[in-house]
């Protein structure tokens, strides 16, 4: 099992380089991803041990902020967020390896994107370890274009169909349900794919699906960035982007499993919260004008079949 974990780690660290390099090619000022490598000390007082590399870009003309973060951590006991629905895992040691990214563009016409790919092994130090993969990618537009959402979902479906014809509809529905703000009765964006507890096939089959899915993120996102990054925008557009970013913050702090897991397990706070946007705003009881550009997004962030 250790060999398989290391193989996935090697894939993720190379993917991190591929993604940051591809994104930098679209940046028009001197902003670059900087590497912040870290290691948790192996001491008795540390609940979580391990290491990682958070790559951050800030202040770009295209990407106002972005993080592509790799981590490999282990602990003696899974936190409550990981065992709430799987009581048989309570008290087990674990290893978790993953890559998580969030890209916050400066231009309100370029959507925010998020992706995450991970493996968990519970009881890795036993004769019967339990493994599963999780991950996916989702898109959060502020001023949506239907063709962008169709391209995003078509890319997702193409990858899913290559491995299992049932995956896209199942993981698309899961994504719509997961990225939902209950207190707002809103979805976070137009969705994509979300899956967890993936071990329904052999390890190699699951590994191949997850790595193909991860490799398709750039195919899904880069064409959208290229198409929208030079659209002119006003302060009104920017203000609405900041307002909608507030929903992103609310979801990450209240509902996101990765954030909750990281904080409950004693993870590295700076890396866990690095996905937050550089700026966001809240307006009391604000509503967009009827039939305005700003009202349009509320029709797009409802679950729908993007692929006819």
UniProtKB/Swiss-Prot annotation:
Pathway info: Porphyrin-containing compound metabolism; protoporphyrin-IX biosynthesis; protoporphyrinogen-IX from coproporphyrinogen-III (O2 route): step 1/1
Origin: domain of life: Bacteria
Active-site positions on this chain: 114
One of the GO biological process terms: protoporphyrinogen IX biosynthetic process
List of residues binding substrate: 100, 116-118, 266-268
GO MF annotation, one: metal ion binding
Principal location class: cytoplasm
GO-annotated cellular components: cytoplasm
Its EC number(s): 1.3.3.3
Cofactors, names only: a divalent metal cation
Region of interest (Important for dimerization), ranges: 248-283
The protein's name: Oxygen-dependent coproporphyrinogen-III oxidase
Gene: hemF
């Amino acid at each position: 099992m250790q060999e398989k974990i290391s193989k996935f780690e090697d894939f993720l660290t190379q993917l991190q380089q591929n993604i940051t390099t591809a994104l930098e090619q679209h940046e028009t000022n001197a902003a670059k991803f900087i590497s912040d490598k870290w290691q948790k000390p192996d001491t008795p007082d540390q609940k979580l041990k391990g290491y990682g590399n958070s790559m951050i870009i800030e202040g770009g003309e295209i990407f106002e902020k972005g993080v592509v973060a790799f981590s490999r951590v282990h602990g003696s006991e899974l936190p409550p967020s990981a065992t709430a629905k799987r009581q048989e895992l309570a008290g087990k040691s674990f290893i978790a390896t993953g890559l998580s990214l969030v890209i916050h563009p400066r231009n309100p016409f370029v959507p925010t994107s998020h992706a995450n790919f991970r493996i968990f092994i519970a009881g890795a130090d036993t004769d019967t370890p339990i493994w599963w993969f999780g991950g996916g990618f989702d898109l959060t537009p502020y001023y949506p274009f239907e063709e962008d959402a169709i391209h995003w979902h078509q890319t997702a479906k193409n990858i899913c169909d290559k491995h299992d014809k049932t995956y896209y509809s199942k993981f698309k529905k899961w994504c719509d349900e997961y990225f939902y703000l209950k207190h707002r009765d809103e979805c976070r964006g137009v969705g994509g794919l979300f899956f967890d507890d993936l071990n329904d096939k052999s390890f190699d089959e699951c590994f191949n699906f997850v790595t193909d899915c991860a490799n398709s993120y750039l195919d899904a996102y880069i064409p959208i960035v290229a198409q929208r990054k030079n659209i002119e925008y006003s302060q009104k557009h920017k203000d609405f982007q900041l307002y909608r970013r507030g929903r992103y913050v609310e979801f990450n702090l209240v509902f996101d499993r990765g954030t909750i897991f990281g904080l409950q397990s004693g993870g590295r706070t700076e890396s866990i919260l690095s996905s937050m946007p550089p700026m966001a705003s809240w307006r009391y009881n604000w509503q967009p004008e009827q039939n305005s550009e700003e009202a349009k997004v509320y029709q797009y962030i409802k679950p729908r079949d993007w692929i006819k």
